[in-house]
Design a protein with these regions (language model features):
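Cytosolic regulatory regions built on CNB/CRP/Popeye-like sensor folds
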Residues: 1-149
Length: 149
């Protein structure tokens, strides 16, 4: 089970069965233990992740504060690679035993280019979700001060 577990998620809305099958073929399921680091801030952005089971804490360290987000099943992270950013801008750690699906950036890029119609749908879905996250983050920031470190 990999991409099939995410079939109903917004990221995959409107994608053809063939495209999903090709995506599934390049996806790798991995089990993570509590405390495992999946991504380190500043590491090369080479993989995109989907959280199938468990909890992943994303922590972005800034000059005078840090921001943390807790991802739950169905969420994705490591999306710096989709924006062609050379490095991740946050770290990701497994908070409890978790199962993720990892997709290598080069393989995902090749698939998106090979099937531009589904590729565009995927990117639009991605942009819609990320845009919503930014709106929610901005709204939360209006109510809660930054965490001082």
């Amino acid at each position: 089970m990999s991409i099939k577990a995410f079939k109903g998620q917004r990221l995959f809305k409107g994608l053809s069965q063939d495209f999903l099958a090709q995506l599934d073929a390049i996806a790798v399921q991995e089990s993570k233990e509590k405390g495992d680091i999946l991504i380190r801030n500043g590491d090369p952005a080479k993989n995109f992740y989907l959280l199938e089971e468990g909890r992943i804490c994303i922590r972005a360290e800034r000059k005078n504060h840090s921001v943390s987000f807790l991802h739950t099943p169905g969420d994705f992270f490591g999306w710096s690679c989709l924006l062609d950013r050379p490095a991740y801008s946050a770290s990701a750690e497994s908070v409890i035993p978790s199962r993720v699906v990892r997709i290598e950036k080069k393989k995902l890029d090749a698939l998106l280019k090979k099937d531009p119609l589904n590729g565009l749908t995927f990117i639009k879905n991605f942009a819609d979700i990320i845009g919503g996250r930014f709106l929610n983050t901005h709204s939360a920031h209006d109510w809660f001060p930054a965490i001082e470190t």
